A protein has these predicted regions:
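Active-site environment of divalent metal-dependent phosphoester hydrolases
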Residues: 13-16, 43-48, 70-78, 115-120, ...
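Active-site neighborhood of phospho(di)ester-bond hydrolases with catalytic His/Asp-centered motifs
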Residues: 7-8, 35-40, 64-70, 112, ...
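Short acidic, glycine-rich surface-loop motifs adjacent to enzyme active sites
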Residues: 141-157
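A short C-terminal boundary segment appended to hydrolase-like catalytic domains
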Residues: 231-267
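Residues at alpha-helix caps and immediate loop-helix transition turns in enzyme cores, especially N-
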Residues: 16-20, 48-50, 129, 161, ...
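N-terminal active-site segment of His-dependent metallophosphoesterases
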Residues: 1-59, 75-76, 132, 138-142
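Extended active-site neighborhood of metal-dependent phosphoesterases/phosphodiesterases
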Residues: 51-132, 140, 175, 202-205, ...
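Conserved beta-sheet core of the metallophosphoesterase superfamily
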Residues: 161-235
Length: 267
């Protein structure tokens, strides 16, 4: 059964150094098919932070699909922000801003929602990006599980308002739902969340899962550090949350939920 280790908002520059080694060990134990990192590898897009992120990714023995977050775009270096906002990301992490991972049983498509503007960290998608991703999802053979990875979320927990949604979410969801998207992975809020798209978008016959990872940084905003592990088949998806245990200095399984594919989508 394909397995995904999903982490987000590592924020090298503000990473909790005690957590890095146990995190690597946890990923090793899970032995995922691939690792999804939904953005914000750095705190301020500095060279030293990208180098630390690169070293961390190089320690993972599994394929990695990573997309940029708003913190991976320079904030104070205005020349870089205006002229080449993804330059350092491409230099140290990867050239591709919207990578794809594909196997016989799943396809995962990354979408870059990080923007040089506005300055407050909001993200958005444009029609060209979404159409390209939708076409890739549609073209996948043998009806795999279809996954979309962004930094900014398509849905938010009840504690957050709609202003935190990814920009142009209605347009994007409509087209990605038509392409058969099953799972949306994101981060940004530093809050763990699992739900389904039918609550917000109400697209007939479509209900995908929205899965948000917490953070690995010291910017936990009241929540302990977490990662997600997804175990997927065409009819069943299990999502397990691993939470940092301060006393044991390990990540422990803290929550599991199972969803099944129905005629109306995933519930």
């Amino acid at each position: 059964m394909p397995t995904i280790a999903h982490l987000s908002d590592i924020h090298f520059g503000r990473v909790d150094s005690r957590i890095v080694e146990p995190l690597v060990q946890t990923i090793e134990a899970v032995a995922p098919t691939f690792v999804a990192v939904s953005g914000d590898l750095t705190q301020r897009a500095r060279r030293s932070q990208f180098l630390a992120a690169r070293q961390f990714l190089d320690r993972l023995r599994f394929p990695v699909l990573v997309v940029p977050g708003n913190h991976d775009v320079p904030l104070f270096n205005l020349a870089a922000r205006f002229i080449d906002p993804y330059g350092s990301y491409r230099r140290y992490i990867q050239k591709e801003l919207e990578p794809v991972y594909e196997s016989d049983e799943l396809i995962a498509v990354g979408l870059n929602s990080a923007r040089a503007f506005p300055f407050h960290g909001g993200g958005r998608l444009n029609e060209r990006q979404v159409d390209r991703a939708a076409a890739r999802l549609k073209s996948a053979p043998d009806d795999p599980v279809r996954i979309v990875v962004t930094h900014h979320p398509f849905d938010v927990p009840e504690t957050h308002g709609a202003e935190h949604l990814i920009g142009r979410s209605d347009m994007a969801m409509s087209r990605l739902a038509d392409a058969g998207a099953d799972v949306f992975l994101a981060g940004h809020l530093h809050v763990s969340h699992v739900g389904h798209t039918a609550t917000r978008y109400r697209i007939g016959g479509h209900s995908a899962l929205v899965v948000q990872a917490g953070t690995i940084s010291t910017r936990g905003r009241g929540e302990l550090n977490t990662i997600n592990v997804l175990r997927l088949s065409r009819t069943r998806i299990e999502i397990e949350r691993y939470t940092w245990d301060e006393s044991g200095h390990v990540f422990k399984s803290s929550w599991t939920r199972v969803f099944h594919r129905t005629a109306e989508g995933w519930f």
